[in-house]
């Protein structure tokens, strides 16, 4: 897992574009971005997501290849990029808990 800038993320996206589209279209799909919360703490990152956004809004990447198939979404991983907010540990249906998404995380995800 390494910390990256938006400029690095943009380069990674450009470098992965052809491969991710080929993978998605092999299943008759368009490329998807899946936005998640990790159900972890603000500094807890997971390799299941291509991109993790910590509580400070810093961007962490688990791979150098955004077309790599990772286990972020059941039966929807091929041709998809998983983006997770490091947040929502112990969240409940009506309460996001002590680790609710921060304004900075939401801004960076947007």
Write out the residue ranges for each language-model feature.
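Active-site-adjacent loop/helix surface patches within enzyme catalytic domains
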Residues: 1-110
């Amino acid at each position: 897992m390494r910390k990256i800038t938006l400029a690095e993320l943009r380069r990674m996206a450009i470098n992965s574009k052809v491969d991710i589209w080929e993978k998605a279209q092999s299943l008759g799909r368009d490329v998807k971005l899946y936005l998640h919360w990790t159900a972890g703490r603000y500094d807890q990152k997971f390799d299941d997501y291509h991109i993790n956004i910590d509580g400070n809004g810093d961007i962490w990447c688990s791979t150098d290849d955004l077309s790599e198939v990772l286990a972020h979404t059941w039966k929807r991983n091929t041709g998809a990029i998983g983006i997770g907010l490091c947040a929502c540990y112990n969240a409940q249906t009506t309460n996001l808990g002590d680790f609710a998404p921060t304004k900075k995380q939401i801004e960076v995800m947007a």
